[in-house]
A protein has these predicted regions:
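Periplasmic OmpA-like peptidoglycan-binding domain that tethers envelope proteins to the cell wall
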Residues: 46-114
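Periplasmic peptidoglycan-binding/tethering modules of Gram-negative envelope proteins
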Residues: 1-42
Length: 114
């Protein structure tokens, strides 16, 4: 029996914040359903930012965003040990931009559930 394909989710954040957008908050139940369907899930949450600000601050903000999502999942009953978090900061842009460019689609976390 082969393992199921990982499910991928993308959540977006408000400017310079670890608060999810209203639209992204609506996606949380879908993520929880994907996690709870699996006997022993592995969840990877990677935080990202746009290029406003310096790289070090953006790396920290990306981690803060990933930890915020982990907190939402843990509060919903997912074991913390099942969730890995990391930050790419501004290093892995969804939408390529010049430095110091505001781009809401880059303010995100990428979630993989398998």
């Amino acid at each position: 029996m082969t393992a199921p394909e990982p499910k991928h989710f993308r959540l977006y954040f408000k400017f310079e914040s670890d608060a999810l957008t209203d639209e992204s908050n609506l996606k949380v139940p879908e993520i929880l359903a994907a996690v709870t369907r699996l006997a022993v899930p592995e969840v990877v949450v990677i935080g990202h930012t746009d290029t406003l600000g310096d790289r070090k601050a953006n790396k920290a903000l990306g981690l803060k965003r990933a930890m915020s999502v982990k907190g939402v999942l843990v509060d919903a009953g997912i074991a913390p040990a099942l969730i890995e978090v990391a930050s790419h900061g501004e290093a892995d842009l969804l939408v390529k931009t010049r430095n110091n460019t505001a781009e809401p689609r880059n303010r995100r976390v990428e979630i993989s559930v398998r």
